[in-house]
A protein has these predicted regions:
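Domain-level recognition of nuclease-like catalytic cores that cleave nucleotide substrates
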Residues: 20, 106-107, 121
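Solvent-exposed alpha-helical segments within well-ordered globular domains of core cellular machineries
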Residues: 32, 36, 40, 66-73, ...
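Short, conserved, surface-exposed binding loops centered on an aromatic residue
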Residues: 10-13, 40-44
Length: 144
């Protein structure tokens, strides 16, 4: 039996976020299982955020990054915000040199900073919702 086929990326819930602790080199099978596990947990837990902790990853190629990026997009379509944390300098250099898509990626130096960033995003989101609610009520009061 291929050990890689049963290897999984551990997922845990913390502060209404799914934290994926990626501490192994990535491969296609592992990324497929990760996507399935993550999206399933996202649906069942109703978490509103995902933090991908890459602190254990020493190298990532363009195809693996695209797969991770695709998983982040899927999670976003399910209503969760994604933050990448713990990318090592060599990994960051490789991603930039490979010219992979890193636009609109929210990132943090480490897991603690990612949790703080997620909390800040929640506050901003709540403030925006409150402002929109007030604007809607004011518009109704004006007869609009």
């Amino acid at each position: 039996m291929d050990v890689r086929a049963i290897q999984r990326i551990p997922l845990q819930l913390s502060q209404n976020c799914i934290v994926a602790s990626i501490q192994v080199d990535l491969n296609d099978d592992l990324l497929r299982l990760f996507r399935e596990d993550l999206l399933s947990l996202l649906q069942s837990s109703e978490a509103d955020g995902i933090i991908l902790d890459f602190s254990g990853v020493e190298i990532i190629d363009g195809e693996d990054w695209d797969a991770v990026r695709g998983t982040m997009t899927m999670a976003n379509l399910m209503g969760a915000r994604s933050i990448v944390a713990g990318l090592r300098p060599g990994v960051v250099s490789s991603l930039v040199e490979l010219e992979v898509d890193v636009e609109d990626i929210d990132a943090a130096l480490n897991l603690d900073e990612a949790l703080k960033l997620m909390a800040a995003f929640r506050v901003m989101s709540e403030e925006n919702e409150e402002a929109e609610s007030r604007d809607g009520e004011a518009a109704q009061g004006d007869g609009r």
